[in-house]
Each structure stands twice: as C-alpha cells, then as structure tokens.
Swiss-Prot record:
GO terms for biological process: L-histidine biosynthetic process; mycothiol biosynthetic process. The keyword Lipoprotein does not apply. Its cofactor is Mg(2+). Belongs to the inositol monophosphatase superfamily. This is Histidinol-phosphatase. PROSITE patterns: IMP_1 (PS00629). Substrate binds at residues 67, 85-88, 185, 213. Induction: When comparing gene expression levels of the four IMPase family genes in exponential cultures of M.tuberculosis, the level of cysQ is the highest, almost equal to sigA; impA and impC are expressed at approximately 40% of this level, while suhB is lowest, at 12% of the cysQ level. Pathway: Amino-acid biosynthesis; L-histidine biosynthesis; L-histidine from 5-phospho-alpha-D-ribose 1-diphosphate: step 8/9. Mg(2+) 2 binds at residues 83, 86, 213. Mg(2+) 1 binds at residues 67, 83, 85. It catalyses: L-histidinol phosphate + H2O = L-histidinol + phosphate. The gene is hisN.
C-alpha cells in the first residue's frame, strides 16, 4: 500500500459521487431484481463499471471484486473490493443513507478504505498505519477515534434490521443485548460502523454481510482504534457477519451473542 493507493481510492470515490448524485431521485432510474431478490440500479452498475475501467488503466496488475460483477474470491495479492452503492434499497426509495465503499486488500487484509456518502455530504477513509479520517461537506478532515465507553449499560448500539437475526436462539440473544445497552438505534448499513469509528456509537452488529459490505469499513474502524470481527470472533471482513466496537466492549458483546 502506498500513498498513491489512498489518493486513487479517493479519486474513485469522487467519480462515484458524480455518478450516483445525478441518479439519486431520477425519475428514469432503472431498477432490476437480482437472483437474491435484492434491487440493483443503473447507478450501481455504472459506478462499478467506472471503477473497474479506472483500475484496469491505473492498476492493471491488481484484482477487482465487486458486488455487481463479481471477481476472484481467493484474496491473494492486491485486490480492490467495491460495493458501488451500499444501501441500494434506501437509494431507490429516496432515503439519503447510502454510500460507495471502495477498499484495497493486500493478501486479504484491508490496507485502504473509503466510504463516500454524497447525499449526506460525508466521507470517511483510512489507510493502514495512518489513522482514520472524515470530512463533512468537503470541510477540513478530522481524525477519528472510537469512544471510551467501557460498560454495556452505558453503550449505544446500532444495527440494520431484525430479519437477519431470525436463527433460533440468535434473535433472543441479540434482543437480550439490546435490552442491556443504554441506547439502540437502527442507523443501518455502512453508517453504523462509521459512527463507531467516530465515537458516536459504541457497538454495531450484523449477522449476514459480504466482504464488499465490510472491507472499507474494517480498516476505518480499526484505524480509529476499534475492533471488527465476525460473530465467531474472527478478525477482518471475511466472516460473513460483523461485530464492530470501540474494542473495550468487544469480548463481552461476543460472549452475549454466542451464549447458550
């Protein structure tokens, strides 16, 4: 990973913002249904195609894995991970909580991540060993740091929906966790994890996620001083589920979600 990789990721996000802004709320937005019954729009495809074209020119030796057009899942060497619009359901309904997620993995470990949410006028990014940062409406970036909350009864928790927690026993444990913490909100998708990195939320959890949902978020959370694992406690974005915390609460959250 070099400084140029971060600059490239930020430039890719700039272009993604241009493409998504003009399609958000467009009356002629094309919406299709994928085999997994989730929506995909012409904006999703346009962003991922543009990212792939740029990487093919500027990083021809790097791999690319994206939500819409796939790619290798061996996770060796240098590989860019792209979720062109995280929060497509929000996008199609006119809800401004959506973002383009772009990450660089080196041998499966995120080294650069950018989360860009133009409808919120916010962006978060991080590079390995260089910290995590955010900017609001293009203002001067500020460095991110997770909270120092050390007790669950004082903690704020965010998630996306209850439907994924339906596995027998898991929903009960999750609801038990929500009953224990101080505050629960469903900020959802990328925003839960970015708020953990900002120190505004202490816990984010999702039972079903893909690597493109997490790769950029993983390094943003970690570089802000937090911790991100699967529900099984495996570090990184590959576990198919996610728990992100300020680090101080992590082990207790995992214990509660895996009890029984």
């Amino acid at each position: 990973m070099s400084h140029d990789d971060l600059m490239l990721a930020l430039a890719l996000a700039d272009r993604a913002d241009e493409l998504t802004r003009v399609r958000f709320g467009a009356l002629d937005l094309r919406i299709d249904t994928k085999p997994d019954l989730t929506p995909v729009t012409d904006a999703d495809r346009a962003v991922e195609s543009d990212v792939r074209q740029t990487l093919g020119r500027d990083r021809p030796g790097d791999g690319v894995l994206g939500e819409e057009f796939g790619g290798s899942t061996t996770f060796t060497g240098r590989q860019w991970i792209v979720d062109p619009i995280d929060g497509t359901k929000n996008f199609v309904r006119g809800v401004p909580v959506w973002a383009s997620l772009i990450a660089l993995l080196e041998d499966g470990v995120p080294s650069v991540g950018v989360v860009s949410a133009p409808a919120l006028q916010r962006r978060w990014w991080a590079a390995r060993g260089r910290g995590a940062f955010a900017s609001v409406d293009g203002a001067r970036p500020h460095r991110l740091s997770v909270s120092s909350v050390a007790e669950l009864h004082s903690a704020s928790l965010s998630f996306s929906s209850l439907s994924g927690w339906a596995r027998p026993g898991l929903r009960e444990r999750f609801i038990g966790l929500t009953d224990t913490v101080w505050r629960v909100r469903a900020y959802g998708d990328f925003l839960s994890y970015c708020l953990v990195a900002e120190g505004a939320v202490d816990i984010a959890a999702e039972p079903q996620v893909s690597v493109w949902d997490l790769a950029a978020l993983d390094i943003v959370v970690r570089e802000a001083g937090g911790r991100l694992t699967s529900l099984d406690g495996v570090a990184g974005p590959h576990g198919g589920s996610a728990v992100a915390t300020n680090g101080l609460l992590h082990d207790e959250v995992l214990t509660r979600l895996n009890a029984g």
